[in-house]
């Protein structure tokens, strides 16, 4: 991250995009790196830098805050997941990161989970879990919607249909008038 001579070499190279892990980095280090690599498309991969990572440590809001601060830059945001507790926690964490603005997910993959591994590999998921994660993420992505704050066409139509309706608190006698007491 703070290898400034490397930043200069990358900037002068023909490399078009750079993937940078920013977990464990200060905001100052991140902003300096972005300034140094201003000629490149940058992919910032955020992940809490303890293996394995518990969900309460994630601080995924950092993705959203960095995205807001760097909105005019040529930057893509991603999330590197190190969840140790299986598919469900992985799905929650990855889906939450997408809601915060991540568009790339990194997840350790282990095609042979039955073989004993080092402690750092406890966050890896098997083939079936990986496929399930991809399926779930593809369902979640459209839920975020577009960056609009007004009603869409369907909401406007529905609102129009219900805003003209009256409902009584009980049965009304013939020819009775609506009042605030009976609607």
Listing of model-derived features with the role each one plays in the protein:
Residues 1-183:
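Catalytic cores and adjacent flexible loops of soluble metabolic enzymes
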């Amino acid at each position: 991250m703070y290898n400034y001579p490397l930043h200069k070499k990358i900037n002068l190279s023909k490399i078009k995009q750079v993937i940078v892990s920013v977990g464990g980095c200060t905001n100052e280090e991140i902003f300096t790196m972005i300034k140094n690599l201003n000629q490149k498309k940058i992919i910032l991969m955020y992940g809490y830098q303890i293996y394995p990572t518990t969900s309460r440590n994630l601080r995924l809001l950092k993705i959203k805050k960095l995205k807001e601060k760097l909105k005019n830059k040529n930057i893509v945001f991603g999330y590197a997941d190190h969840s140790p507790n299986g598919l469900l926690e992985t799905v929650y964490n990855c889906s939450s990161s997408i809601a915060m603005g991540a568009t790339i997910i990194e997840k350790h993959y282990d095609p042979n989970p039955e073989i004993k591994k080092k402690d750092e590999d406890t966050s890896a998921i098997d083939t079936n879990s990986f496929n399930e994660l991809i399926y779930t993420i593809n369902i979640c992505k459209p839920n975020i919607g577009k960056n609009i704050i007004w009603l869409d066409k369907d909401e406007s139509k529905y609102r129009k249909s219900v805003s003209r309706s009256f409902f009584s608190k009980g049965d009304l006698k013939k020819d009775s008038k609506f009042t605030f007491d009976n609607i």
